[in-house]
């Protein structure tokens, strides 16, 4: 039995919306499928987008802790004690939600004085 797609479409053109809705439901039940568009595809596309904000994490202070504390003070505007606590408590975020350029700039400044930095 060959199906003629054009004949089927012509028959469907004469059907009412209610009849077409019943037909869709019957096809879904018979073949165990759904007429809904897949939602997972939208999530996958969102994951591929470029990241717009970064967190700069001080992973390790390195050998020149005093220099790292000075750079952290300059970057964050924190006081000496707070900057020292941040460096001593590594790994900790130095800055959060910054642009890629700013994150790379901060990373370069910290690495220049011997710190290990991770961008997240």
Curated annotation (Swiss-Prot):
Gene Ontology MF term list: mRNA binding; structural constituent of ribosome
Q: Which GO terms describe its biological process?
A: translation
Under the heading Pfam families, the entry gives:
Ribosomal_L12, Ribosomal_L12_N
UniProt keyword annotations, A-Z: Ribonucleoprotein, Ribosomal protein
The family database entries (Gene3D superfamilies) matched by this protein are listed as: 3.30.1390.10, Single helix bin
InterPro entries found in the cross-reference section: Ribosomal_bL12 (IPR000206), Ribosomal_bL12_C (IPR013823), Ribosomal_bL12_C/ClpS-like (IPR014719), Ribosomal_bL12_oligo (IPR008932), Ribosomal_bL12_oligo_N_sf (IPR036235)
Q: Which domain of life is it from?
A: Bacteria
| Cellular component terms per the entry's GO annotation | cytosolic large ribosomal subunit
Q: How does it assemble?
A: Homodimer. Part of the ribosomal stalk of the 50S ribosomal subunit. Forms a multimeric L10(L12)X complex, where L10 forms an elongated spine to which 2 to 4 L12 dimers bind in a sequential fashion. Binds GTP-bound translation factors.
Matching HAMAP family, A to Z?
Ribosomal_bL12 (MF_00368)
Functional summary from the UniProt entry: Forms part of the ribosomal stalk which helps the ribosome interact with GTP-bound translation factors. Is thus essential for accurate translation.
- State the similarity comment: Belongs to the bacterial ribosomal protein bL12 family.
Q: Which NCBIfam families match?
A: L12
Query: Which PANTHER family does the UniProt entry name for this protein?
Result: 39S RIBOSOMAL PROTEIN L12 (PTHR45987), LARGE RIBOSOMAL SUBUNIT PROTEIN BL12M (PTHR45987:SF4)
This chain's protein is named Large ribosomal subunit protein bL12
Q: Which organism is it from?
A: Lactobacillus acidophilus (strain ATCC 700396 / NCK56 / N2 / NCFM)
| Gene it is expressed from | rplL
């Amino acid at each position: 039995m060959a199906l003629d797609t054009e004949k089927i479409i012509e028959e469907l053109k004469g059907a009412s919306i209610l009849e077409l809705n019943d037909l869709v439901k019957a096809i879904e039940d018979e073949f165990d499928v759904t007429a809904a568009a897949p939602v997972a595809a939208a999530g996958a596309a969102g994951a591929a987008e470029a990241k717009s904000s970064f967190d700069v994490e001080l992973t390790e202070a390195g050998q020149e802790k005093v220099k790292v504390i000075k750079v952290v003070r300059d970057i964050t505007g924190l006081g000496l004690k707070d900057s020292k606590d941040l460096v001593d408590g590594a790994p900790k975020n130095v800055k959060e939600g910054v642009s890629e350029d700013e994150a790379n700039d901060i990373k370069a400044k910290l690495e220049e004085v011997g710190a290990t930095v991770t961008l997240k």
